[in-house]
């Protein structure tokens, strides 16, 4: 009997099913940063907070007034883990002190990227979050088996090119799915 290798979801979207009961993830679209035998890490990309980059910069540098343009840069709720820690998902034409290369993207956790974005010399595309979503080994696989999530290929246009309130539906539409027509009942063969 042939054993199948596990299928991991790194660099894909997770689409919360309409019946998702967990308030941390109901109606969310999550970008999977890492997924392997040890667990998974992702960033929710469609939940803006009532914070802007200006608010963050005021906390980091209280003696300086942030540029007015930073009032228009939203901060997203990336997930329920380490909600005081910032993560910036961005295009990879720039690198910073604490950047990790992803597939065509980078993830940065150092403050230098925030200052670069504020100065207008940051990456062309970026999304700033506080916190992340984390799953222990096997946890995400179990949630997928329980039909809590759909997955689909990552599309940078969804994250960087459209309003946050359109992202979940756009990801589902990329699969030909209208989330409003799905049932919470599922069968297994």
Curated annotation (Swiss-Prot):
List the Pfam families: DUF179
| InterPro entries according to UniProt | AlgH-like (IPR003774)
List the GO cellular component terms: cytosol
Q: List the cysteine pairs that form cystine.
A: none
Superkingdom of the organism of origin? Bacteria
Q: So what family is this one in?
A: Belongs to the UPF0301 (AlgH) family.
Q: Which PANTHER family match?
A: UNCHARACTERIZED PROTEIN YQGE, UPF0301 PROTEIN YQGE
Protein's name according to its UniProt entry:
UPF0301 protein PP_4995
